[in-house]
Amino acid sequence: MQRPTRESIEGLRPISRSLSLDLVAAIGYGVSGALVSSLLPTIARRGGLEPLGLAVLSAAPFLTNLLSVFAGRFGPRSTRQFALLRGVGAGSLVGLAFVPGTTVIIAVAFVFWISISFSSPFQLRLWGATYPGRMRGRVVGFLGTGRAAATAMAALVGGLLADRLGGPTAVAMAGLVGAVCALAYAGFRASAAAAPLAYSARESIRAMRARPMLQRVALAQGFFGGGFIAAGPLFALVYVDRLDLSLSDVGFIGVLGAAATTISFLAWGAIADRFDGLAAMRYGSLIGLAGLIDYAFAPGLPVLLIAALAIGLSSSSIEVGIAGVISDQTPLASRAAAMSGWNAITGARGLVAPFLMSALVQFGIVNVTTGLLLCAAASGTGVALFWWAARRARADMAASIGVDPAA
């Protein structure tokens, strides 16, 4: 076995420093994002927000994803700008402590998700310029593990604080933690290659459409993720209207989901490095589909806990898979543009799905159970398309080297 040299150890120090700062920022995102995702819809529902209003709240991250097609012009171009944008997004949640109300909840949710959507293309390019490609999946898995662990702890503590101090105060405290942790990116030493070239909305879409593999995976994720997006507002109806759960119960569901995500991130990252990102998405989507079906029939909290575990395992596989597929299919120079195009294409379906299903439920056309089963049917289509995309990828690779894929 070759012993490590002084030069090899010195070469790892910049990566270790960057990884540490990345982890601090990821923890802050996990804390603030936990309460935005798990508690904010329930808080809004208890505040009187109707199903269509919940749909607006659920659509917020996808509208901002669609708008991130303009990130090439208005997104961060340095690590300091990156830190500022993430800090402002998390810090906006503090406003709930002073001006509570459903309108303010929707407004701060939009500000929070804008900060995430507009910074994610820069972040993916930053990772590509900072970390070696051979360890990309494990880096994403490591950071995801830290963020998911923070999410689990924040969901547990946040649920307890929400019951004692009130939901808006708990969310505001999480936003403060996220804003402070986002400052870690200001100390990130990135190479000049990390600064993306300016690109237009048209160029970001072109970067996606130029790669058939990305189009196939985006189509699959459109159906799979679309089913979960449509189901999002219905989850709050299950918690409040069907089962009348407390905020601490909802927080505990979030804890288990985040715990499942935490323990699975590194495993999915290793799978992505060993095979490819699509392998993680194929198997993870099957697990997530089972969790969505559980929600449709859940008679009580125990079944919801099982569903949360399944969905948590699935969400980490999708996140690792997306980063892996886009990185594998694009050179560093066009990676930020491709990520913006991905966000825009997948975000467009997020604008329609929650409103469609919430309207069907609110106007009495379907009940919550039927609505969730329709969502599961859409996600099941996405699962099938992930497997189809993998088969096409193998066929294309075989054709490129002159091998019969059926052999």
Feature annotation, model-predicted:
Residues Q2-S16, A192-A220, V403-A407:
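Juxtamembrane intracellular "pre-TM" segments in multi-pass secondary transporters
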Residues P4-L66, G72, M213-I253:
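Helix-loop boundary and gating motifs at the non-cytosolic
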Residues P51, G133-L143, L247-S248, L332-W342:
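Loop-to-transmembrane helix entry/capping segments in MFS-fold secondary transporters
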Residues L67-R80, A162, S264-D276, V361:
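Helix-to-loop junctions at the C-terminal end of transmembrane segments
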Residues Q81-G95, A279-D294:
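Structural signature of the two symmetry-related core transmembrane helices
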Residues A97, V180-A192, L373-A407:
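Multi-pass alpha-helical transporter architecture, strongest
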Residues F118-Y131, S317-T330:
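Intracellular juxtamembrane helix-capping segments at the cytosolic ends
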Residues A162-G178, A359-S379:
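A membrane-interface helix-boundary motif in multi-pass transporters
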